[in-house]
């Protein structure tokens, strides 16, 4: 429980516990303790903490912070974060939102890495041709998986290519959109 309260992204069993007579039960118990502990976190503490001036001028950091604050203000249960590399989900995770972060990526490497990020539930997803198609497909996948329901408000954030930089990779998380699940 202390590891959760201190903001740890992941916990693991010690060698002795993992090799003991009941390793599966030990993992289940650790999971239950972590999930129960998360119910009592002061999520606003993470949003109120001081941020360096350098991070305040960082586009990705600011968009992710704004997404977390908006999700909190609107009581959105999910932040939708499509990301090829998982960068957006990692940036969101550092703010420890109360909302679930749904990380979606076409890269299985990124999906596996996102399993270690705090508050992120990763999903494998296909690439999309446009920003609208990306966000629509992301929400549809989450609807199919039972993560979001019709009528819920979700906050979506991603790094998308602009028309001016169409041939360059996305370097920043640069959009946030508030959506009602249809």
Task: For each feature predicted by the language model, list its residue ranges.
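Short, small-residue-enriched loops and turns at beta-alpha junctions
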Residues: 17-22, 53-57, 131
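Long, charged amphipathic helices and adjacent flexible linkers at domain junctions
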Residues: 30-67, 175
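C-terminal helical cap(s) of enzyme catalytic domains, especially alpha/beta-barrels
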Residues: 17-39, 169-179
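Glycine-rich phosphate-binding active-site loops on the catalytic face of alpha/beta enzymes
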Residues: 1-23
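Beta-strand/loop-dominated core regions that host nucleotide or nucleotide-derived cofactor-binding catalytic loops
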Residues: 121-124, 136, 140, 162, ...
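Nucleotide-binding motor/catalytic cores of P-loop/tubulin-like NTPases across gene-expression machines
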Residues: 88-90, 96-133
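Generic secondary-structure signature for well-ordered alpha-helical cores
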Residues: 5, 9-10, 31-43, 68, ...
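Conserved, mostly hydrophobic/aromatic
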Residues: 3, 92, 154
């Amino acid at each position: 429980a202390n590891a959760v309260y201190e903001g740890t992204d992941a916990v693991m069993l010690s060698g002795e516990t993992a090799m003991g007579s009941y390793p599966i039960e030990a993992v289940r118990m650790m999971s239950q303790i972590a999930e129960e502990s998360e119910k009592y976190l002061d999520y606003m503490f993470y949003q109120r903490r001081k941020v360096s001036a350098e991070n305040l001028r960082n586009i990705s950091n600011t968009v992710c912070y704004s997404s977390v604050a908006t999700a909190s203000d609107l009581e959105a249960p999910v932040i939708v974060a499509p990301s090829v590399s998982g960068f957006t989900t990692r940036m969101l995770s550092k703010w420890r939102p109360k909302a679930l972060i749904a990380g979606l990526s076409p890269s299985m490497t990124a999906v596996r890495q996102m399993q270690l990020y705090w508050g992120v539930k990763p999903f494998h997803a296909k690439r999309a041709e446009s920003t609208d198609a990306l966000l629509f497909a992301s929400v549809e996948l989450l609807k199919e998986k039972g993560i979001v329901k019709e009528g819920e408000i979700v906050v979506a954030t991603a790094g998308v290519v602009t028309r001016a930089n169409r041939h360059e990779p996305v370097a920043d998380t640069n959009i946030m959109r508030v959506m009602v699940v249809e």
